[in-house]
């Protein structure tokens, strides 16, 4: 079509502004709403607080963005494990499985929403993963002055059963001991090897092939997924456009490009997330020294030991949530401190008082401790998902006062389910009894 | 009937026709605008029963704009546009009809490009150029100064000029 000038734009906008619907249509619309309002009594409805929108509003952005990775990995587990049939992509998967190490860049940008409410955020990460040593990632964010600042280095070291997070600016070094189950889970699910995990998930879903093209002088074939349910849940009315470009000669990916948007408030404001994985260096030589976290003078060391993942831990974590919120969190995977920092319960106010006046580093350490029981319950749930124990959690509707309602359940055997009730007592029930209990859940 | 439903009925009496006109202008389909009106008031009802809305008119307006652009995003097939060369030039004295506008590719492209925007920029632009509201009125609705609204509208105009000048460029992937 012809080029559109500013004059064209203005003239057409004026034309559009003069448009009036027919009187009959307006009358129908108004009368229909009037009738609906006269009859309509909707019970109070709360919208899912989505993890990413909470994170983006966080005053403790650095800590929160680091949590994004943890959450994304945890939630990703459910589909990373899947396998399926495919032809071309199956060949790509086979190639990736042969790779011993890979380095790549990951960039993330969020835009949209009300600028008065949401922080605009841009982050980039360099990843290095090795089958032998584990993974290392260096996180940088675009500060308000437009400069890239490094704020986190994260090491996942399965052989040493540790995860280490370093905050260079605050000079903090946090070491978390992992259980055998955690390590096995990491190995099995390749959390640190995102491209492999993602490819496995894509093979399970519906994807389309894109025509060949050239990217940075390399001939590539593309694949595209638009199923909004396939991606991590970002909010209501999610839309996803996920493209992967593969070098046709090596059959290895050269770029992953994700655009995902979702509503983040009741007015329908949307946030758009743009994630790109690029600059892949497959089978890059690695040195064991690269996986030795640097230890420098003047750092504060903090060792965190998560409690074992079991029912008792889960109940302890849920107790902490009740103290902090006077209810259960809507999503059990919510391991960020934001809910507690906004709550007005005595326990939450105590926490808020305790971190008042602390430096950013001191706050990180304080919250790392604080998150232990909450992470315990989230991790227990993820392990249940991982082990296909058919878990479910109903914190969105069940409260501490619902002593006989199912708050959380998981399968123990073919004939038994374990149930944690709203008052946090636990029982083993038959599948039939569970069905009966779940039919009585509050809507 | 609850207080919140009374407030919504008052809003319907006060601004129902205006909101329906807005939805029609943004979707270019009367039937869709009628459906979205219902959806709008269902959303408002859901929200108003759980929290206090300080400026219901502004809230309704923003929600309507978001609903309309969401519909456009997910119903691209209903956005027919004839290339600019083939469409009759709009004449300001003519009274526009839906048939002429829906066939107008420029208007479809403008709406698609505006749909790619988010937040205050989109709201201010739609209020100013599609609803013909004054800068002062928009500033009051969006809790900004008239100067900020002028700047926002100017930036959007520049964006539209640049975006729509790039013939063949794909807009708004998501």
Region spans (language model):
Chain B
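DNA-recognition helix of helix-turn-helix
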Residues: 65, 136, 140-169
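A short pre-motif secondary-structure segment
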Residues: 124-128
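C-terminal flanking helix
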Residues: 16, 20, 41, 118, ...
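Structural recognition of an alpha-helix C-terminal capping motif at a helix-to-coil junction
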Residues: 35-42, 54-66
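Arg/Lys-rich amphipathic alpha helix in sigma70-family domain 2
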Residues: 62-82, 103
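A short, charge-rich alpha-helical start-of-domain segment used by transcription regulators
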Residues: 1-21, 31-34
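Internal acidic/polar
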Residues: 78-103
